[in-house]
């Protein structure tokens, strides 16, 4: 019985982490590209992938979905794990 409770707690911790990461998929680009290069809209992503042509549009923020978790998502993930751990210890 004790082993089953541990497995269930670990499962819900991982599940809460995945849910938090999947809901925080908006990436904000401070220097977007003037044109869209496939899935890359950030200037950094364009230069990183050797798409160096084109200029930048200033004072424009581009939002788009990406399968990469942002720092905030990772931070919320660790917070949810800590909360679930503290709650399970009571």
UniProtKB/Swiss-Prot annotation:
Q: Is Hydrolase among this UniProt entry's keywords? A: no
Q: Which residues form the signal peptide?
A: 1-23
Keyword vocabulary terms for this entry:
Antimicrobial, Disulfide bond, Fungicide, Plant defense, Secreted, Signal
Q: What GO biological process terms does the UniProt entry carry, in alphabetical order?
A: defense response to fungus; killing of cells of another organism
Q: What is its main location?
A: secreted
Is this entry keyworded Ribonucleoprotein? no
The terms describing its cellular component in GO are: extracellular region
Give the similarity note. Belongs to the DEFL family.
What name does the UniProt record give this protein? Putative defensin-like protein 64
**Which organism encodes this protein?**
Arabidopsis thaliana (Mouse-ear cress)
């Amino acid at each position: 019985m004790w082993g089953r409770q541990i497995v269930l707690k670990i499962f819900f911790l991982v599940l809460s982490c995945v849910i938090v990461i999947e809901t925080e998929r908006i990436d904000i680009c401070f220097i977007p590209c003037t044109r869209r290069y496939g899935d890359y809209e950030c200037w950094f992503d364009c230069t990183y992938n050797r798409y160096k042509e084109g200029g930048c549009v200033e004072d424009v923020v581009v939002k788009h979905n990406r399968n990469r978790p942002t720092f905030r998502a990772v931070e919320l993930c660790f917070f949810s794990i800590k909360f679930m751990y503290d709650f399970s210890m009571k």
